[in-house]
């Protein structure tokens, strides 16, 4: 009875992979979860009830065929499970590690709603695809024929790389341009190693190179070439730069030293982990060692910052967030990990200013009451009069979200249209901007979001580019000449 299909959840409890003790994982940047054993993966995959309406798949941005690869895993058919997994996702082993499954597939699992505990979808996904790499099943997707057309991709993050792989598989010569010296974007420089070890990204980047994708690192559009120049070189150009401009806080003392942006802090930490020498880390300005650290914000980036500060040897780490725990945008799992590792959360508190002469010594804050819900359904923060207090701080990290850069100006293309939020305006069916042959995908279109949404957008953009290139090739010569 225990092995009966679709009833495994009745007899088998939810079990996550083994997690390293908090005291141990505070000491390094290695991933905190072990991989499932074969037996554990089979057991946990067998908990899937094979629902008639798979809400896990419905709530997956790339529409992964989750019940199918869970069933195949439970039957020991791992190579088939891998084939199903990679059919809808360019980076499944990455999503298995960093997706907030508690907000997506697992949070909407029918078994979770029935109080039996969700199927551990993300951990099984990681197991399937890590096994595929170990067994040599992962191969470059080379085209059956070359089309003789080239596409330029600006940005080597998840949206850009997903599109690059799809386009290369269709037969395009794909050139990826990125401002950094390594490909991967925020997968390399924004997400800490304890969530995503960089070797996992590096092997994917190499796989695309083996398929024929051509990389141009240290290439900045607007400096090394303008967007008009790239348009003349390629049949189509995809803008997938992400959003890197940090939201700031305007408060007394915000210009003091040692008040830094989250991405600057995380990028420095990741570069050091990769073996680079970074002056800002060496001189202590972007190094939490021995400091009282306060992180402002409640999203996943804030969680990355507090957990990084712990590993760098901070004396204390506090997270200041204006709403309560249940209303924070970050993953609840990440909050739990942070608490285990020694982070203190100060809920319903907002910064009002900073103390110090030349460098910050404290954060002046006020207590917050959550009032009536706004149009989005979230309760509106309201300041409690007379509730001021100060938190000691030698380093303040602002993790308040990201905004788009001024791309029309940066790319020397003033005709490129943006929305009122500064994101690129696209036709959401084709992903094309207002400029012929210029497409956009990922955060630069939807705003700061999840890696898995960037993958979906990149895949969709590749289809839009392919349809555009085909139509252009089939058009009458006179029209094409115009």
From Swiss-Prot:
A single GO BP: L-glutamate biosynthetic process
MF-aspect GO terms: 4 iron, 4 sulfur cluster binding; glutamate synthase (NADPH) activity; metal ion binding
Listed pathway(s): Amino-acid biosynthesis; L-glutamate biosynthesis via GLT pathway; L-glutamate from 2-oxoglutarate and L-glutamine (NADP(+) route): step 1/1; Energy metabolism; nitrogen metabolism
InterPro entries linked: DPD_II, FAD/NAD-bd_sf, FAD/NAD-binding_dom, GltD-like, Helical_ferredxn
Residues annotated to bind [4Fe-4S] cluster: 95, 99, 105, 109
Annotated cofactor note: Binds 1 [4Fe-4S] cluster.
Cofactor: [4Fe-4S] cluster
Record EC number: 1.4.1.13
Catalytic reaction(s) noted: 2 L-glutamate + NADP(+) = L-glutamine + 2-oxoglutarate + NADPH + H(+)
Residue ranges of every copy of the 4Fe-4S ferredoxin-type domain listed in the record: 39-72
Other comment: Glutamine binds to the large subunit and transfers the amido group to 2-oxo-glutamate that apparently binds to the small subunit.
NCBIfam families, A to Z: gltD_gamma_fam
PANTHER family: GLUTAMATE SYNTHASE [NADPH] SMALL CHAIN, GLUTAMATE SYNTHASE [NADPH] SMALL CHAIN-RELATED
Assembly behavior: Aggregate of 4 catalytic active heterodimers, consisting of a large and a small subunit.
Name of protein: Glutamate synthase [NADPH] small chain
């Amino acid at each position: 009875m225990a092995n009966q299909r679709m009833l495994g959840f009745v007899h088998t409890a939810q079990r996550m992979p083994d997690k390293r003790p908090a005291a141990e994982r505070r000491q390094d940047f290695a991933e905190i979860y072990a991989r499932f054993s074969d037996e554990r993966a089979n057991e946990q995959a067998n908990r899937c009830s094979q629902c008639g309406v798979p809400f896990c798949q419905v709530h997956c941005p790339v529409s992964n065929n989750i019940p199918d690869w869970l069933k195949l895993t439970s039957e020991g058919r791992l190579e088939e499970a891998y084939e199903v997994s990679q059919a809808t996702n360019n980076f499944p082993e990455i999503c298995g590690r960093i997706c907030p499954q508690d907000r997506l597939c697992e949070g909407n699992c029918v078994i979770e709603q029935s109080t039996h505990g969700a199927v551990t979808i993300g951990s099984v996904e990681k197991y399937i695809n890590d096994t595929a790499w170990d067994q040599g099943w992962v191969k470059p997707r080379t085209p059956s024929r070359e089309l003789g057309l080239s596409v330029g991709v600006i940005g080597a993050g998840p949206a850009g790389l997903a599109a690059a792989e799809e386009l290369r598989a269709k037969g395009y010569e794909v050139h990826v341009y990125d401002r950094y010296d390594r490909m991967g974007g925020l997968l390399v420089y924004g997400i800490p190693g304890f969530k995503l070890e960089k070797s996992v990204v590096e092997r994917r980047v190499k796989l695309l190179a083996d398929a024929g994708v051509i990389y141009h690192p240290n290439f900045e559009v607007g400096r090394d070439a303008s967007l008009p120049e790239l348009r003349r070189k390629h049949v189509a150009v995809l803008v997938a730069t992400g959003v890197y401009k940090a939201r700031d806080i305007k408060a007394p003392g915000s210009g003091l030293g040692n008040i830094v942006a989250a991405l600057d802090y995380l990028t420095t930490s990741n570069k050091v982990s990769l073996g680079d020498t970074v002056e800002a880390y060496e001189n202590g300005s972007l190094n939490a060692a021995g400091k009282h650290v306060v992180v402002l914000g409640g999203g996943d980036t804030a969680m990355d910052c507090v957990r990084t500060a712990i590993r760098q040897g901070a004396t204390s780490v506090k997270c200041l967030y204006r709403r309560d725990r249940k209303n924070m945008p970050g993953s609840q799992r990440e909050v739990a990990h942070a608490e285990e590792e020694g982070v203190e959360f100060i809920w319903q508190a907002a910064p009002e200013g900073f103390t110090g002469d030349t460098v910050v010594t404290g954060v002046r804050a006020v207590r917050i009451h959550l009032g009536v819900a706004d149009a989005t359904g979230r309760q509106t923060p309201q300041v409690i009069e007379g509730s001021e207090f100060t938190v000691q701080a030698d380093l303040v990290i602002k993790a308040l979200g990201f905004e788009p850069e001024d791309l029309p100006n940066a790319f020397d293309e003033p005709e490129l249209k943006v929305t009122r939020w500064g994101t690129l305006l696209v036709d959401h069916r084709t992903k094309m901007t207002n400029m012929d042959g210029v497409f956009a995908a990922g955060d630069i279109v939807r705003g700061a979001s999840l890696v898995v949404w960037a993958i979906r957008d990149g895949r969709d953009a590749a289809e839009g580019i392919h349809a555009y290139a085909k139509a252009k090739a089939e058009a009458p010569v006179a029209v094409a000449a115009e």
